[in-house]
Every structure is written in structure tokens, then in C-alpha cells.
A protein has these predicted regions:
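Short, small-residue-biased leader/transition segments that mark boundaries at the very start
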Residues: 1-7
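Non-catalytic C-terminal accessory modules of carbohydrate-active enzymes
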Residues: 9-31, 35, 40-167
Length: 167
């Protein structure tokens, strides 16, 4: 994670459990006064391998406006930041899409409650169609390209679906 790189570059060596300890510390102290708090903590919980907690916080964030969990704020409008963040967590955390390197990378980590996830994603002028299950991903790109699936470089031919199994 980028925080590990940043800390290392600054000369700090963080213990392996720093994320878990900090997450648990702050969860005991946060009021979740903003609905955005839940989705941020969902992301962190997944990073710390607290899958059930991540799922619970994700659901709360997803339904925060719909169910008006703060008692009357939905009439004032929806929180587009939370909406965008839930999409980000869906794609970056659960689907595992990573655009931080030169090659597009996907490392699926679907919640066990999900059987499948399908979405379109445009990266560097290439349109990808992804269809994920718990054990495979099928990818179609509109141009010849390549991407990483769980660290393995996968070549794609334009408009030809490629299925990759993982576990």
C-alpha cells in the first residue's frame, strides 16, 4: 500500500499489524458523524482482512441516504461523496482494479455474499468489460492490450473474451 511506501521513504518501519491496531483504535472512538466515515472504514477494514466488518460498513454506507440513517438529512439531498466512494470501494477493493501502475491490474476479492459482478471500465483509451465470479474473471477489451490478473500478465485480443481462473 502507498502508506507503506511513504513510511519507508521517510525512514519509518511500521509493524505488520499497524493497520489493524489503528483501525480498531479509531473505530472505538469515531461517531461516524459523516456518512462518508463508514465507507472509509469499510475500505480500511477490508485492507486489514476484517471482511465481515468491511461488508457491514459498506452496506451502511451504501444505504445511508436511501434509509436516511442520520434521521432527516436525506430531504436535504444525497451525499454524492458517499455514492462515489461506494463505487470506488466496489471497483478498487472488491473487484480489485488498480490503475496506479503502467499496466491495469485486477485482483478480485469479492465479498462472499456476492456471486458475481460485471462492469465496464475505461483505462488509457481501452474499454474493458469485466465479468467476475468468486473463481474467475472474463475480460473483453475493445483493442489489443494486456493487463495483470492477480499478478500474471494476460494478453488480450480485441473483442475476444478471455477467461482467467483464480482462487
Amino acid at each position: 500500500w502507498s502508506s507503506d511506501v511513504c513510511s519507508s521513504d521517510l525512514g519509518y518501519q511500521l509493524p505488520a499489524d499497524y493497520l489493524e491496531k489503528n483501525l480498531l483504535y479509531y473505530l472505538k472512538r469515531t461517531s461516524h458523524g459523516s456518512t462518508l466515515s463508514r465507507i472509509v472504514h469499510a475500505q480500511l477494514a477490508e485492507m486489514a482482512q476484517f471482511h465481515e466488518l468491511s461488508w457491514q460498513l459498506y452496506q451502511e454506507a451504501l444505504y445511508s441516504d436511501y434509509r436516511d440513517i442520520q434521521g432527516g438529512t436525506t430531504a436535504e439531498g444525497i451525499h454524492t461523496g458517499v455514492m462515489a466512494a461506494t463505487i470506488h470501494v466496489t471497483l478498487a477493493t472488491y473487484a480489485g482494479v488498480d490503475t496506479r501502475q503502467n499496466e491495469l491490474s485486477i485482483c478480485p476479492n469479492l465479498p462472499e455474499h456476492w456471486q458475481a459482478l460485471a462492469f465496464q471500465f475505461i483505462h488509457q483509451g481501452v474499454t474493458y468489460q469485466f465479468s467476475l465470479t468468486q473463481t474467475s474473471v472474463t475480460i473483453t477489451a475493445d483493442k489489443d492490450t494486456q493487463l495483470l490478473v492477480q499478478g500474471a500478465l494476460i494478453p488480450l485480443t480485441a473483442e475476444r473474451p478471455k477467461e482467467v481462473h483464480y482462487q
